[in-house]
Amino acid sequence: MLKIKASITGVIGGFVSGMTGIGGGTVMVPLLTGFVQMRQHRAHATSLVIVIFVAISAATQYLMRDQIRWDLAIALSIGAVVGAQIGARTMHSMPEKNLRIIFAIFLFIVGIRLIFGNSIIDLSFDGQTLSSNMQTVSALLIGLIGGAFGGLLGIGGGAIFVPALVLILGQDQHIAQGISLIVIISTALSGTAVNLRSGYIDKKIVIWVTPPAIVLAIIGGYIAGLLDSETLSQVFGIVVLYVAIRSFYSTWKKSRQPNNS
């Protein structure tokens, strides 16, 4: 039964990763903790290993369509890896509850914007008018901020990277997702290198989840290529809204626990 649950987790997480470029961990971690009944630390560490294979598989679809800007991907990766280390080292001294609320509000606004466009919330900035060097510097800063939030909150940065690339740097939704997957590979490798020493990685779950996740990541990436940018942005917006609502709920749930009162 555990193997079946792990396989279902791989199917859902892999498909979401390929479709949206957010790595799959955003969906996998809740499934691993709630559905597979893993402890939080083990779920995070195990998910990170799976995400490496999932992101590589999904990225191949974007690579074949030439939907990756490597200058931005490299700059984002450098910033994200550094930011993640900073976030992870300072997470115990920061008010996690407030950070989660801010993050959830940010994602909620972004989700509404991506689903309904400028008619409700206009967050657009024409980043295409920036010089190539300024876009690279901006990508480095976005990576630093996104990586730091990821390290602080124990989340993947894809939910931050993709909206920032679209709304700030004016990138097409497909290209933003392709870039995000490359960055996620870098950050997942960095995080896994640290986790290998912690003993939190469940190799059995990795073996069960990864194969279906890889297959569905490729399928998700292929389907994403069939959608126009506006439709794909709306799909991504729905996923981002889910992440925002889940973040609100988990923060509320923690606040009601006796040791948090």
Predicted segments with their positions:
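Juxtamembrane transmembrane-helix boundary motif
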Residues: 1-15, 34, 40, 60-152, ...
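N-terminal signal-anchor/start-transfer transmembrane helix
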Residues: 8, 12-18, 27, 190
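Transmembrane helix boundary and interhelical junction motifs in multipass membrane proteins
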Residues: 21-29, 152-164
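Hydrophobic, membrane-facing alpha-helical anchors
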Residues: 22-30, 54-57, 129-139, 183-190
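Hydrophobic alpha-helical transmembrane segments of integral membrane proteins
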Residues: 26-27, 49, 159-160, 182, ...
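Small-residue hotspots at the loop-to-helix junctions and early N-terminal turns
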Residues: 44, 174-181
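Membrane-embedded alpha-helical segments of transport systems
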Residues: 49-58, 90, 185-190, 215-216, ...
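Transmembrane alpha-helical segments of major facilitator superfamily
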Residues: 50, 75-76, 179-183
